[in-house]
Amino acid sequence: MEFRKWISISLGAALLMSILNGCGASQTTPNHDSAADKGGIRSAAPASPSGSNAASLRTPAALDLTGATIITLSGSTVSIEGSGAEAEGGVVTITEGGIYAVSGTLDNGRIIVNAGSADVTVALSGASIVCSYGSPLYIYQAGTATVHLMEGTENTLTDGESYTFSDSLSSAADEEPNACLYSKADLVIEGAGALAVEANYNNGITSKDSLEIYDSAVTVDAANHGVNGKDSNTIDSAILTVTCGGDAVRSTNDSDETLGWVSVLNSTLTLTAGEDGIQAETSAVVSAGTYAITSGGGSTATPGDDVSAKGIKAGTDLTLSSGVYTLDCSDDAIHANGNVTITGGSYTISTGDDAAHADGDLTVSGGTLDIQDSYEGLEGGTVTVSGGDITVVSSDDGLNAAGGNDGSGFGGHGMGNAFTPGGNSSAITITGGTIQVLAGGDGLDSNGSIEMTGGTVVVCSTGGGDGALDYESSFTLDGGILFAASAGNMAANPSSLNQPALSVGFGQTLEAETYVQFKGDAYDFVFRLTGQASSAVFSAPELEGGAVCTVSYGGTYSGESARGLCSGGSYSGGTLLAELTLETGLTSYGQTGGMGGRGDMIGRGDRPEGPSGNGMTPGGDFSTGGAGGGEPGEAGASGGGNPPSGGPGGQSPSGGTPPEGDTPCESGTEQGS
C-alpha cells in the first residue's frame, strides 16, 4: 500500500508539472476542524491533482474473471466457489488477495475484506447488498482495494440508520466504519457498470487513503457526506450523481500538504449538497466535463453562520478549465483560500455570496462566465482578466480587489467585504476579454489600483451611494473600450489616461435599456444601459484629442447588444446631448457636484483624508476641489470643481453647449464640467 501511495503522489506531482505549466481543494466534517478553517492565504501543495485538458489518467480494461473466486448471494445464504473467502451468518470475509466475483442479493449481511497488504478486487455483477447494522462493503485491510463494476450490470449497497460497533474490526470511538462503502486502504472504483449507494447512517463512500473513480456510473444518496477520499479524490471519465446532507465530493487530509487534493476530469457530475459541492483541503482541479452543483439549498437559501455551502472550494489553489459548469449555491460558487485560475469553460452561476472568490489572486484568461445573481461577482486580493467573456449581476460590487481573507474562508457563510486590509497591493488588472457588470454597489472596486490596457468593459452601477468605478490609489487607462455608467453620486474618473476619455452627465436619470451613442468621424459606439444611469465615463482607442464627438441618448438600435456594446446595426432617433471637442486626456461635460468614490471623482475630486477619513470614511474638509477640481465655472479639461457647498462645478471650455431644447440641466450654472 505504501509503495502504491508513493506512486500516486509522484504521479500527481508529475502530472501537475507537465500539465499546469501549460495552465492549477475543503470543508470540515461537522465534528472536526480542518487546517483550512483557520483562514488566511495558503500556499499550494507540492503534490497536487492532474490538470486541465489532460487526457484520461488511464485506459480502462475489461476484467478477466478466469480463476476468480465466485461468490453468489441468495437472500440470507451465501455460496462460495474458490479460495480466499469464507461465509458465516450472512457475512462474507475475504482474507487473501485476488479477484472475487459477486452476484445476487444479500438481505442483511456484508462483505468484509481483511487481506493484510494484498491487493483485492471485488467484481460486482448484478449484486445487491443490504446491511442494517454496518457497512455492506467494508475494506478493513488490503494493499489496494478495487471495486469493479462489470459492464452493463447494476449494483446496489444499502445500509441502515444506525451501526453496531461490536466486533474487533470496528471502533465506536473512531466511528469506523461510518460509510456504506468504507475502505481503510486505497480504494479504486472502476468498470462500465453502475453502482447505487443508499447511505442512511452517515457517509456514502469513504476511503481513509486515496479514492479513485474511473469510467463508472455511481449514484450516492447519503445522510451526510457523499464521496470522500481522505488523502486524495480522483474522478476520471465517470458519471457521478450525489445527493447528500453534507459535502458531495471531498478530500480532507490536513496533516500532509502533499495530500488532501481533488481532481475531476472528463466526467459528468450532478451534485446536490447540503454543504459544499466539491471541497479539497489543499488544491483542486476540475476540467473537461459537465458539472451541475447545487449547494446549501441554492442561491436563494441562507445557510447558517457555521455552515460552508460553497460550490467548488479549495484550501490552497483552485484551477478550472474546459467544461460546462452550472453552479447554484447559497455560499461562494467558486472559492479558494489561495488562488483561483479560470482558463476556459462555460459557467452559469447563481450564488448568495461571491461568484468567484480568492483570498489570493483571481485570474480569468478564458471561458464564458454568466453570473446571473451574486452578492459580489469576482473578488480577490487581486483580480486579473486577460480573456474570456464575463457577465456579472451583483447586489454589491461587480469586481472587487480587496486583499486578504474575507471571513468566509472554509467555515461558514461570509457576506460582505471583511478582508484583512490589502492596501495598494490590491489591484484589478484588465488586459483583454469582455466584461459586462450590472452592480447594485460599485462596478469595479479596488482597495488599491485599477489598470486597464485592453479588452471591453461595460459597467452599470445602480447604487445611490456607489459608482461604476471606485479605487483607493489610482486607475490607469491605457487601452481598451470602457463604458462605466453610474446612477448614484459616487462616480469616479480614471486618474491617469493614455487615451482620450469622456465623462458626461445626462442631466437626468436614464432608465435601463436606454441607448447611449458616442459618434465621431472614425467611430460609432452605441451602448445599451443594463441599469439606471445619470452619468457615464467612456473611452476607446479610436478617440482623438481635438476631434469632435457627439453624445446622444434614447432612440433605437437595429443590431445586437450583447454585453451592453451594440454591434452589427444602426442607431437612430436619439436625443442629442452635446457635441464635444475632445481633450487629449479627460473631457468632462454636464456633471453635477456631489459625493464621489475613491480616486478622481466626477464633479469634485478626491475624497480627503480628514480626522476620520481614510479614503473610505468621510472626513476632513470637503470644500477642496482636489483632482479635476476648480471653482464653479472655472475652465479645466479635467472637469468640474467641488464648490464649498458641495454643489455643481463649472463647465469645461471644450464641452460646447447642448443644442436648443436639449439642455440636460435646468440651467447652465448646474452643468458641472
For each of these PLM feature ranges, what is it?
Residues 1-3:
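N-terminal secretory signal peptides that target proteins for export/translocation
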Residues 5-12, 16-673:
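A composition-driven surface/loop motif
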